[in-house]
Structure formats: structure tokens, C-alpha cells
């Protein structure tokens, strides 16, 4: 089930009955300062699902107010999830924190990505102010197998450094 501001669109099976494709729609159109959004995704034994979004997620500039999105994914034994949302666009002056935790049981498989675009580059906007913080944790049977923390401040030298983004506005 889903609760506002999220809505699941009708599931479909373009690959046949073996894997269900689901699209999560964020009906508000974007995430603003002081928003706190939570997603809890639970796949039962032997489930096979691909989850995506219909469009990029927009993180609006917030005058310092923090927006938070928390995604918790639990996959039971032999479950399979492809978590492939469209990109996240972090507008200039946004203050955004995302936490994702994936819990895997025996033989469960998760494939996922997060593609982040800093600033609305099609408009020439750069991410010169604000903060972006991302936590990703993947656990199998209560043991960590991957823990990653990423943090970018607006106008950070890492946006331009060769050991950073090298002047490119996208990471993923």
C-alpha cells in the first residue's frame, strides 16, 4: 500500500510474469525544506520486482531548512529487487539528507542506483549554496556489507577537482 504523498501506479509486466514493474509517484512534485518522507519497501520470499519513478525527483532550494528522505528496503529469502529511480535534481540552496538502508535475507538480491544532479544544469544553474548528505547501508542477516556516506556542500572544491566530479554536475 502507499500513503500520500506517494502513490503506486498500476503494476505491469513487460518482461512477462517473472518480474513485476512498479512506479512510485511523488504526487507533490518535489521535496522542500522541512519535508520528511519515508518509504518502507518489503519484498516477501521469492518476489521479483523492479521499482522506478516516472520522472526526476526535485529537491527545492530551502533557505536552510532541511528536507529528509528515508528509504528502508527489506528483502526476504530469495527476493530480488531492482531499485532504479530516475535522477535526483538538487536545486541550488537545497539542504537535503537521504538515508537508505537495505536489509537482505539469504539469497536475496538488490540492484540499485542513485543518480544525483547538482543544480539545474539545463538552465545553467550550479549548486553554489546548500548541502547534500547521503547515507547508504546494505546489510545481510544483520551484518553490514556496505556502508557509504557522501557529503557535498555548495561550491565545494570537489565539484571541480579531478579526484571529485571534475566539473561535471552528476554523480551516481
What residue ranges belong to the model's regions?
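N-terminal, charged/glycine-rich beta-strand/loop interface patches
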Residues: 1-87, 92, 99
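Solvent-exposed residues in well-ordered beta-strands and their adjoining turns
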Residues: 42-44, 76, 103-105, 139-141, ...
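Short C-terminal domain-edge/linker segments immediately following a structured domain
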Residues: 54-55, 71-73, 81-84, 104-105, ...
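Extracellular structured ligand-interaction cores
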Residues: 68-70, 97-99, 107, 133-135, ...
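Acidic (Asp/Glu-rich), glycine- and aromatic
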Residues: 91-99, 104-129
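A structural signal for small-residue-enriched, beta-sheet-centric alpha/beta enzyme cores
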Residues: 116, 120-172
Amino acid at each position: 500500500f502507499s500513503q500520500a504523498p506517494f502513490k503506486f501506479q498500476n503494476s505491469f509486466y513487460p518482461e512477462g510474469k517473472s518480474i513485476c514493474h512498479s512506479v512510485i509517484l511523488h504526487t507533490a512534485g518535489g521535496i522542500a525544506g522541512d519535508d520528511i518522507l519515508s518509504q518502507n519497501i518489503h519484498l516477501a520470499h521469492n518476489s521479483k520486482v523492479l521499482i522506478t519513478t516516472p520522472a526526476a525527483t526535485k529537491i527545492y532550494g530551502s533557505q536552510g531548512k532541511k528536507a529528509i528522505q528515508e528509504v528502508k528496503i527489506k528483502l526476504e529469502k530469495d527476493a530480488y529487487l531492482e531499485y532504479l529511480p530516475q535522477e535526483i535534481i538538487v536545486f541550488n540552496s537545497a539542504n537535503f539528507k537521504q538515508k537508505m538502508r537495505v536489509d537482505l535475507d539469504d539469497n536475496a538480491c538488490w540492484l540499485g542506483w542513485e543518480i544525483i544532479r547538482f543544480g539545474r544544469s539545463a538552465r545553467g544553474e550550479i549548486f553554489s549554496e546548500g548541502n547534500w548528505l547521503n547515507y547508504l547501508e546494505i546489510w545481510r542477516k544483520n551484518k553490514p556489507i556496505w556502508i557509504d556516506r557522501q557529503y557535498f556542500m555548495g561550491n565545494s572544491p570537489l565539484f571541480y577537482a579531478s579526484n571529485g566530479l571534475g566539473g561535471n554536475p552528476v554523480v551516481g
